[in-house]
Amino acid sequence: MAAQNNQEVDALVEKITGLHAAIAKLPSLSPSPDVDALFTELVTACVPPSPVDVTKLGPEAQEMREGLIRLCSEAEGKLEAHYSDMLAAFDKPLDHLGMFPYYNNYINLSKLEYELLARYVPGGYRPARVAFIGSGPLPFSSFVLAARHLPDTMFDNYDLCGAANDRASKLFRADRDVGARMSFHTADVADLAGELAKYDVVFLAALVGMAAEDKAKVIAHLGAHMADGAALVVRSAHGARGFLYPIVDPQDIGRGGFEVLAVCHPDDDVVNSVIIAQKSKDVHADGLGSGRGAGGQYARGTVPVVSPPCRFGEMVADVTQNHKRDEFANAEVAF
C-alpha cells in the first residue's frame, strides 16, 4: 500500500510540475481559452482525494508549489477583475452575479462557513459586525453572507489593492440593503490594530499570507488585536489542493491566541478547507497565546475535525475519542 501511495504521489507531482511549467510560459494570465484550459486541468488534477502531503515534499517540489500558488493567485485576481468590470456595466450589478462561472461555489462555501459558525461558536451566531480580510474585486463571500445568512450584520472589507476595492464598491452602488451594510478599506492587515477589536467575526481569505510563516504572522497579529471571544474563520487547503492554496496548520492558529473549534476538509469537487476558531482570553500582547495547551500546542488527535464528506457528513468533536456528532446536512465547499 505504501509503495502504491508513493507511485501515486510521484505521478501527481510529475503532472503538477508539468502544468506549472506550461502555466509559467503563458504570456498572460488574463482570462483566455489557453489560460482557462490549463487551470481547469490543474484543478481537475488537484481536487480528487490524494495521499500526498505537500508539506513533506522535497525542496524542488516545494519551490514549484510555492511558485504555482503565486500563479494561481495572480490568475484568480485577473479573473475576478475581469468579471467585476463586466458586472459593473449593468445598472444593477447584483442581479447578474450568476454570470461569474464559480458563483454557486461561493454560495456553498459561505453556507458552510455560516453553519459551522452557528454550530461551533458558543451561544450561536448573529454577529453585529464582520471583517473580511482579502476581499478582492469580487467580494462574493461577504455578499452571500450578508444577503442570505446575516441580514442585520455590517461588513467591513479589507484589501491591499485600492483598484480591487474601487471595483468592488461599484457592484453595490445601487443596492439599498446589502450595499448599505458594505464598506471597503484599502489597508494591510498588519497595519490594523484597534479597529480589529470591534469585530465579532473576522474572515481570513486563503491567499492572505501565502507562505506559512507569513500566514502565522497574520494570525498572531489578529490574535493580538481581536476581542476576546471573537471568532476567526480561516480558509485553508488539504491534500493535493495544497498545490492551489496555502495550507494552514491549526497549531499556528493555537499559537496565535485562538482555540480551534472545528476543521472541515471537504473531499468532493472543491478546494478550500475551513477552520473555525475563537479568540482565547489568555492571549498575550505579542499575539502568541496558549491555545489549548502550553505554547498553543494541541495534543495529537484532539483538533476538532469535520469529517469528509461535508455533505451529509459527521461532525467529529474529538478525534481521540472518536466522538461523533449529528449529521451536517447539505453543506458543500468550493473555492
Curated annotation (Swiss-Prot):
> A GO BP term, please?
nicotianamine biosynthetic process
Tell me the organism: Hordeum vulgare (Barley)
EC number(s) reported in the record: 2.5.1.43
Q: Name one Pfam family in it.
A: NAS
This chain belongs to the protein called Probable nicotianamine synthase 2
Instruction: Give the matching InterPro entries.
Output: Nicotian_synth, SAM-dependent_MTases_sf
Question: Which GO molecular function entries does the Swiss-Prot or TrEMBL record give?
Answer: nicotianamine synthase activity
Look up the domain of life of the source.
Answer: Eukaryota
The record's catalysed reaction(s) read:
3 S-adenosyl-L-methionine = nicotianamine + 3 S-methyl-5'-thioadenosine + 3 H(+)
Sequence similarity:
Belongs to the nicotianamine synthase (NAS)-like family.
Which keywords does this Swiss-Prot/TrEMBL entry list? S-adenosyl-L-methionine, Transferase
Outline what the protein does. Synthesizes nicotianamine, a polyamine that is the first intermediate in the synthesis of the phytosiderophores of the mugineic acid type found in gramineae which serves as a sensor for the physiological iron status within the plant, and/or might be involved in the transport of iron.
Kindly report, in one word, the top-level EC class recorded for this enzyme.
transferase
Q: What is this organism's lineage? A: Eukaryota, Viridiplantae, Streptophyta, Embryophyta, Tracheophyta
